[in-house]
Amino acid sequence: MAKYRAGRINEEVKKAISSIIQNDIRDPRLTSMISVIKVDVTKDLRYAKAYVSILGDEAKKKETMDILKKSESFIRKELGYAVKLRYTPEVIIELDTSIEKGMHIDAILEKIKGSDKNDNR
């Protein structure tokens, strides 16, 4: 039962943080596409670690992460309005690079698959 509740809370907080980032942060420098991949809320509901994926080059990712880090307190305040919990968790934004790593591995596998076809001929 506890795992089910934790999963529901994680999903609800994820939806709320995603909505806040997309709709409520009014910074003209936020032009990259930002996706909230996963949110882990601690058992005591004090902290929420949000993993985000940012589309763009490294400089744009760094700039976007700096903006999001500075907006953590605003996101927490808005999260308190959006999700009714005993405590409003402190939001910690982390960059998730798993999608880029997966794409890199796929490219390597395709390259290997292509070289195997050429070797068999």
Swiss-Prot record:
What is the protein's major site of localization? cytoplasm
Give the top-rank taxon of the lineage listed in the UniProt record for this protein. Answer: Bacteria
Q: Which Pfam families has this protein been placed in? A: RBFA (PF02033)
Location of this chain's protein in the cell: Cytoplasm
Q: Provide the protein name.
A: Ribosome-binding factor A
Task: Give the Gene3D superfamilies listed for this entry.
Answer: 3.30.300.20
User: InterPro entries recorded for this chain?
Assistant: KH_dom-like_a/b (IPR015946), RbfA (IPR000238), RbfA_dom_sf (IPR023799), Ribosome-bd_factorA_CS (IPR020053)
The similarity comment for this entry is: Belongs to the RbfA family.
Spell out the NCBIfam families in the cross-references.
rbfA
